[in-house]
């Protein structure tokens, strides 16, 4: 449910 994304920070899902 949570992945490391450089766009959202540390926890965010790309929808």
From Swiss-Prot:
Q: What is this protein called?
A: Peroxidase 5
Instruction: Cite the entry's keywords alphabetically.
Output: Calcium, Heme, Hydrogen peroxide, Iron, Metal-binding, Oxidoreductase, Peroxidase, Secreted
Reactions that this protein is recorded to catalyse: 2 a phenolic donor + H2O2 = 2 a phenolic radical donor + 2 H2O
Which stretches are annotated as coiled coil?
none
Per its record, what are the GO molecular function terms?
lactoperoxidase activity; metal ion binding
The record's free-text note on cofactor binding: Binds 1 heme b (iron(II)-protoporphyrin IX) group per subunit. Binds 2 calcium ions per subunit.
Using the UniProt record, give the first listed, main subcellular location.
secreted
Tell me which Gene Ontology terms the entry assigns under biological process. Answer: hydrogen peroxide catabolic process
Enzyme kind, highest EC tier: oxidoreductase
Spell out the GO cellular component terms annotated for this protein, sorted alphabetically and separated by semicolons: extracellular region
Task: State the function annotated in the UniProt record.
Answer: Removal of H(2)O(2), oxidation of toxic reductants, biosynthesis and degradation of lignin, suberization, auxin catabolism, response to environmental stresses such as wounding, pathogen attack and oxidative stress. These functions might be dependent on each isozyme/isoform in each plant tissue.
Q: Where in the cell is it found?
A: Secreted
Q: Which organism is it from?
A: Capsicum annuum (Capsicum pepper)
